Amino acid sequence: MPRKTPIERYRNIGISAHIDAGKTTTTERILFYTGVSHKIGEVHDGAATMDWMEQEQERGITITSAATTAFWKGMAGNYPEHRINIIDTPGHVDFTIEVERSMRVLDGACMVYDSVGGVQPQSETVWRQANKYKVPRIAFVNKMDRVGADFFRVQRQIGERLKGVAVPIQIPVGAEEHFQGVVDLVKMKAIVWDDESQGVKFTYEDIPANLVELAHEWREKMVEAAAEASEELLEKYLTDHNSLTEDEIKAALRKRTIANEIVPMLCGSAFKNKGVQAMLDAVIDYLPSPADVPAILGHDLDDKEAERHPSDDEPFSALAFKIMTDPFVGQLIFFRVYSGVVESGDTLLNATKDKKERLGRILQMHANERKEIKEVRAGDIAAAVGLKEATTGDTLCDPGKPIILEKMEFPEPVISQAVEPKTKADQEKMGLALNRLAQEDPSFRVQTDEESGQTIISGMGELHLEIIVDRMKREFGVEATVGKPQVAYRETVRTVAEDVEGKFVKQSGGRGQYGHAVIKLEPNPGKGYEFLDEIKGGVIPREFIPAVNKGIEETLKSGVLAGYPVVDVKVHLTFGSYHDVDSNENAFRMAGSMAFKEAMRRAKPVLLEPMMAVEVETPEDFMGNVMGDLSSRRGIVQGMEDIAGGGGKLVRAEVPLAEMFGYSTSLRSATQGRATYTMEFKHYAETPSNVSEAVINAKQVGRG
């Protein structure tokens, strides 16, 4: 079956923004104008097509990036039909993982900014992620009809805060309630959209007299930026500033955008149906097709470098970038095809797991509606049914020509909570639900706490875990109660305790019990638990020595201070005695346990707490606030450096986990939400005595 749309006319784009910049409304308008969606869904009615999880519709925020295919022939119908695959990405910092994984499979991005709020915190995070994956981008300043709208301030902020070179290709006509349309700086005409047709119809008009001078000033800047694309153009431009043709300007801006040198900038009001149509034209004019992007690199099964070009003639290769559970078809694997062709029913190799699987149905998604298709080709984004083994980040490829594409990296979870099923019936369903959710979301983990037997869930933030618990209830019918975030303390000793004995004797008629062990206990930093048998002359028979060790090992699970596990201790079994009739394994197990408890009390027991390596990326203006806040949390700052590309400062610190609860909220308020942080476990360290006392007292109160 020949290709319907040439790969040069594909655009795989993401629409990214800070929460509330109006990104979902913008996507809705795209679906409307491209004819996919005949009724405009409004976010504030909870009717937006792309926000298809119930929680998203309630909260009015986008959580899951949905993939949608649309077709566009240009605002004036003067382009050959282009196929646009849109990945909608969330704007909340707890869902950064979703943005990260969609950036990995995009060719270009449209950054949506609020005309009043401008470059906000999540905009900075998304920008860094786009830099990491070298994603070319255009900027759309939305909500130009709001009070306080300022297009040119946002243009400056992109330069100052993001170190991006924003090149306006439009300027607004009017602002706030007088916002009417835009001046197209390439055509040097004003575009006015018709309200009656919801912006489907528009007219080109002369530039309003009061804007002519400003339009010429910004056109000059745009043409100069275009001229820098090549020596020839620059020479032509320097000879005569008006000599560049419309086609030359567009081609030059396109070249520089794809090289990540400039960011073309547009504006509008998605809600008022103005500007989105021209933004779609800019997606076609300036963002790359899969053919404009370098070949994707990977390695074969022998670890030799390999690459795939975006062509149907190359062997099939694709990356699974998202897993979702669909109520009708079960598990959906979203994947991006980088090369080759695959049909439903074909056998694929999951090169990451080295397992072959048959590809069942292939679905093209429009938000949460689906259309079955027979095949996918290089550049396509689709969802597959029937792949049991695939997880996020896996490479799918031709079994005859294996390749493993660069793996996605996912951050470690930073917050944990205990979760308990409310009823026995919920118990079984909860395990299944949590495993399914963990499969969908690599930044969410599930484990069982050996000490308490509780199920512990870990994720990227409090909102993240809240939504997981909510999804368990809605999608799997599991009612669960959630505990407070917890810290896993440990206990150890500071000094040596020698000749400590444990004697377990029970002799009251009949067969008695007799076990007697003498031990030496010492610190064993960083080496865990060790047991040394130093018995001489058979004072304890050989067969009873493992029982002493077993008794101590059981006692390690609950220390003498607050019942936390004991780590990093060395025990020497030095002496003891036995009774020919009454000694048995159980008696020596008890003797070992008693000796260890007593030795621990004598060897100055201390509490250990987990220390976290914390990295904070912050704009320079907030350095003082960030450092002060870390110090107040018993943090030790270990270094600072400039972020590449001038994006502020990176602060490295070591902070106790116990002090990090509520940190994301506190960091947001200390930096107006413009800083982000990551945190991972580093090692255990001794807890200061005042903190240690509070923990021990709380534990004793808890035991009642």
Curated annotation (Swiss-Prot):
Keywords tagged on the record: Cytoplasm, Elongation factor, GTP-binding, Nucleotide-binding, Protein biosynthesis
> What coarse category fits the chief subcellular location reported for this protein?
cytoplasm
According to the lineage, what is the superkingdom?
Bacteria
A GO molecular function annotation here is: GTP binding
Q: Write out the GO cellular component annotations.
A: cytoplasm
Membrane-crossing ranges are none
Query: Gene3D superfamilies attached here?
Result: 3.30.230.10, 3.30.70.240, Elongation Factor G (Translational Gtpase), domain 3, P-loop containing nucleotide triphosphate hydrolases, Translation factors
| Protein localization | Cytoplasm
| Ranges of residues in domain tr-type G | 8-291
Among the Pfam families in the record, one is GTP_EFTU_D2
The biological process GO terms on file are: ribosome disassembly
Family the entry assigns: Belongs to the TRAFAC class translation factor GTPase superfamily. Classic translation factor GTPase family. EF-G/EF-2 subfamily.
UniProt function note? Catalyzes the GTP-dependent ribosomal translocation step during translation elongation. During this step, the ribosome changes from the pre-translocational (PRE) to the post-translocational (POST) state as the newly formed A-site-bound peptidyl-tRNA and P-site-bound deacylated tRNA move to the P and E sites, respectively. Catalyzes the coordinated movement of the two tRNA molecules, the mRNA and conformational changes in the ribosome.
| Record protein name field | Elongation factor G 1
Q: Which gene encodes it?
A: fusA1
